[in-house]
């Protein structure tokens, strides 16, 4: 077994001992330590092209861009094979899959044993967060996938910078990953919060294999945050600059397919001249209390791992600019001459394509050319609207926290919480509608507290209690809001135009955070009222706006019944203040119905 480059570029005994131990288990032919340099990126890319792991795109149209298609059984996160391995099942809680740690190490160890024979073991040191920030966390991912190593080079600050930050410390996340035989029957993603360790085997897909992303930055980090008194959240961070030059920062949590990246990269409508929205982050926020008593946030990532289908110049021009160079496209469709396409792109599909499975595809086919979860991995620095503070080690001060799900009924366009506890209640009960295929029942609400349901690294009730406990740590807390861009008319049409016009709602929230906008008190929270939103230049009827902001008491009685079932699922660790918030709202709704 050989080791390169420069043999071992660290003298950290903790790290060297662990790498040796993992090499002994996985038995690679060669160990390669990544340094994060441009020369290395070119060399690894050439290796990946030679091995047909990557296919170069037309370098005139897509400079520095490459295409990858995964195994057809390996296209998304696998929640049912994702485990939290805590000493007791209660510590993982009722919303996570649990495996006893010794059993998990034994079970996965048997799969890892010899899994890298004939392969290179890449040692990928990386930092989540600006490398000089007190927020920063170091991880080391060992992987047998050059695709993973190259993606980690985009998504995190990778290589020498991480080893320099680590020094001789033992405080690093130990991540072991092998594609192994990519067998769904031998696929496990296991998190060991007490050991600051992640073992992932049998998948090469982003969320399962890029261990810095969901695994460390949310599941492990949420556990560390609970113990250390901060928040690791599934939230975008955006900077809003007014025409007068005032800058405010918000963090927003939306579940998948609810427009997080679009909101983070929003372009204000023509009716808002002089306003600028810049991206600090599009997916993850780490937040700590600053010396001034405010909540400060950093984006731990260094790139965007975005869903391609539906992304176009209308929905997200900044994302389209971000992927123009040095991007890896996974499971989109491509043309034989090195162009790419996906459903929802600005132009119609070409007559013939190679689909995401590598098969010929003709226009008019009922099959999707690009996989619905096909992705782009793009460097954050490509974003023309990136915030200049994206690498600031202090982070940015958060004025508002926004929660939002996808609800066709019930939840109005925007609400401001009465207080922190009420805001945590709104976040704890947020969710999105699904179709229950077995019953054909449409509109079943999948609760997704703070958009974190698949990513909480410990018991959900304890996580919500941590949110409540944070109030005493934040002398100057941000205001909390709930939004719903997705309410529909009786005919099934969206009532609110969304996209850039969400700026109108954002402006009201920013003004409320600054203490300069009026609001109307309702039984659900504060709302803008009839005149609170700036609607000039908006081609939407007054009736549609009224319907988007309406509070229907009958719908809320049903909603509170559904919330009761959700709270029962959380069991005995559900914080009593959240149950009380539900009970108080139910009383307000019933009292209002009697008055009516």
UniProtKB/Swiss-Prot annotation:
SUPFAM superfamilies: PEP carboxykinase N-terminal domain, PEP carboxykinase-like
GO BP terms in the entry: cellular response to glucose stimulus; gluconeogenesis; glycerol biosynthetic process from pyruvate; oxaloacetate metabolic process; propionate catabolic process; response to lipid; response to starvation
EC number: 4.1.1.32
Catalytic activity of the protein: oxaloacetate + GTP = phosphoenolpyruvate + GDP + CO2
CDD domains: PEPCK_GTP (cd00819)
Cofactor mode of binding and number, as noted: Binds 1 Mn(2+) ion per subunit.
Disordered, as annotated region: 362-388
Claim: Chloroplast is one of the keywords in the record: no
Annotated catalytic residues: 258
Keywords per UniProt: Cytoplasm, Decarboxylase, Gluconeogenesis, GTP-binding, Lyase, Manganese, Metal-binding, Nucleotide-binding
InterPro entries registered for this protein in UniProt: PEP_carboxykin_GTP_CS, PEP_carboxykinase_C, PEP_carboxykinase_GTP, PEP_carboxykinase_GTP_C, PEP_carboxykinase_GTP_N, PEP_carboxykinase_N
Highest rank taxon of the organism: Bacteria
GO molecular function, one term: phosphoenolpyruvate carboxykinase (GTP) activity
Annotated Gene Ontology cellular component terms: cytosol
Cofactor dependency: Mn(2+)
Residues annotated for Mn(2+) binding in this entry: 214, 234, 283
Purpose of the protein: Catalyzes the conversion of oxaloacetate (OAA) to phosphoenolpyruvate (PEP), the rate-limiting step in the metabolic pathway that produces glucose from lactate and other precursors derived from the citric acid cycle.
Family: Belongs to the phosphoenolpyruvate carboxykinase [GTP] family.
Subunit (UniProt): Monomer.
Protein name, UniProt field: Phosphoenolpyruvate carboxykinase [GTP]
Organism: Anaeromyxobacter sp. (strain K)
